[in-house]
């Protein structure tokens, strides 16, 4: 970069010229015939994927699929100081787990790669060179100490911190002298023009006079890495992004991005800024909340469809909110023009109910049920292992029957290996004192039950069993039918309360 600056000085190019302005384009949905819809999800690998990121990725995915477009994953990893090992792999893994895999990504590749910004530095250098040549950018030699003093002084005066543009109007001689001492200056973008108004597809018409409230922003750091503002503009242009769907926190930055597009002579994409996903109490989702990461939900047995369902149910973009929507239904029903400016409040206490609906749907699908049986077998092995007195409980037919009987009653597959359902897999340990506390006629009742089973055998139906059980307490002083049923429940399951005694016995 220093060599380029010296060449510009030698050629006598003006460092104070302004960038070229392109015509304002009417903002519209832009999904008509012949339009190649290309959207991107561009997280920073500074942490693992969480629900807020999943929602942004999902809206991009369903928008792309609704219009037969492409969904791109781009990792914005230019801030090397905040890089978290394993985060890049986790983001792509979790998108695939959620059922919304990218069409192009660091792992999958594609025609617009590479898909990690740290591997695209040459493109940013070329854009910076173009901006320096037209005078739309200039070198900044201010030290971190000076910038920190500016910030503290502004805060002391109750003002918004901003750069004072000190290096903007340096002469060629001054720049040459500075370069001799500091060959790696930062590069700032000159905010001289009024930012154009633009029509956001969610928030409507916007105009932000960024130059009146901010100093000239850094677009290239002294280490040769770009800042977000330059990198996202360069990447969206070279990757052919048609629509930028991102969080509303970036709405105010769009003015800078449009000025960069103008200075580089490029047409901007359509912008749609999505309202934030907040906690139920209105607070922001935070990476400090350990339970908002997708890995947590996957480990806890929540289904991807239930997460996609709840994060769209609490927001907007659909004609109505309803529970139980699948991904194909989300794609069909999604309408970007229905996304409102209101933040979405996420109530995770409702997630078990969403998961119950989606789990029940899978149980009722034969092929999906077979996959659930395999997962349940692994869960039972892991939970009970050597405690299994009879490995016949791992028989797929038995497990399939359990799933069909308990569908609608369980919220997660893991519920079936909780202590409440342990009787399905192991014999309960019940002491004689526990049985005697229910009835003094334990032995008599046991003999009557055995006799009933020997007489009826496999021909015993639920209706027959119900009638026969009512006879078990006949002639037993101090023992009611309720005592008999409680005794059987404890003997069979180790619990005094079960949803259906007859299904357990069956």
UniProtKB/Swiss-Prot annotation:
Main location: mitochondrion
Subcellular location(s) of the protein: Mitochondrion matrix
Renumbered ranges of motif 'HIGH' region: 45-53
SUPFAM superfamilies: An anticodon-binding domain of class I aminoacyl-tRNA synthetases (SSF48163), Nucleotidylyl transferase (SSF52374)
Motif 'KMSKS' region mapped to chain: 284-288
Catalytic activity: tRNA(Glx) + L-glutamate + ATP = L-glutamyl-tRNA(Glx) + AMP + diphosphate; tRNA(Glu) + L-glutamate + ATP = L-glutamyl-tRNA(Glu) + AMP + diphosphate; tRNA(Gln) + L-glutamate + ATP = L-glutamyl-tRNA(Gln) + AMP + diphosphate
Entry keyword set: Acetylation, Aminoacyl-tRNA synthetase, ATP-binding, Ligase, Mitochondrion, Nucleotide-binding, Protein biosynthesis, RNA-binding, Transit peptide
UniProt GO cellular component terms: mitochondrial matrix
Keyword Nucleotidyltransferase: no
Protein name (database record): Nondiscriminating glutamyl-tRNA synthetase EARS2, mitochondrial
